[in-house]
Amino acid sequence: MESEQRITWFKVDAYTVQQRKSWYSQVADAYNRARPRYPMKLVYRAVELAELDKNAIILEVGCGPGTPTTSFASLAFSMICLEPSLEACELARQNCAKYPDVEVKNITFEEWELEPTKFKAVLSATAFHWIPPEIGYPKAADALEDNGSLILMLNMQAQPDYEVYQVLHQVYQIHAPSLGQYETRETQEKNFRSFGKFAIDSGRFQDLISEELVCEVSYTINDYLTLLSTYSPYIALEQQNRDSLFAALREALEKNCGESIEVSYLSGFHIARKI
């Protein structure tokens, strides 16, 4: 499988509906604990550009355990959030328990019954590529009120310093060669920019605005390995292969990095207006 951050729509036809529903179920708790949050600076900027006022209703597609949800909910928006994984859905409900105007539904976007022109914004954070584009964009547009906005937020895969990567590369070559490619900042920026183009190419959206920033995070080795376990290429590994890889990664990290590892990632959004 190609890297999670390369925009390939995950070859969704290769997976059954049930497989797509449960893909992250086994790592829902790890996802909740380890995935980076979306910077509030970007959240505020998205709210500004989408012209969301206090009465705006947001439809979130693929909310996961509520990683982006709580950021928008904290700004007092009403939200209907769709999440196909039962495990992630339950975590999202726990994380959003203090926000009475947030409803989390255990359902796919495809199965969800369309509520036409109800929403000021359709929000999806590192999730919309799981939906076939010929379904996702038209349905999102139909759910939006006139001049409503599609907000696609993305966190690209966290990358260690190149010196650390060189150490880990040797491990990947032994245990999982397909996962050993280093994504440069330029590569991540290119992949990020390409994602926004799909919305325009759908013929249902216009006036694309894209912004991004570089984020830096320090992880303990345990937390970094937990983070890796939530990325799709690692989920796809056979259990024995994954266990061997993670044991070797841990050994290399503890030997060369001490107790923590510094990583960086590109975080950003694409906002497009309904035609």
Where are these regions (language model features)?
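Conserved catalytic/acceptor-binding region of the Class I
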Residues: 145-215
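Conserved Class I S-adenosyl-L-methionine
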Residues: 3, 65, 188-275
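A short acidic, Gly/Pro-enriched loop at the edge of an enzyme's catalytic core
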Residues: 112-122
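Conserved class I S-adenosyl-L-methionine
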Residues: 2-53
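Class I SAM-dependent methyltransferase SAM/SAH-binding core
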Residues: 57-59, 65-111
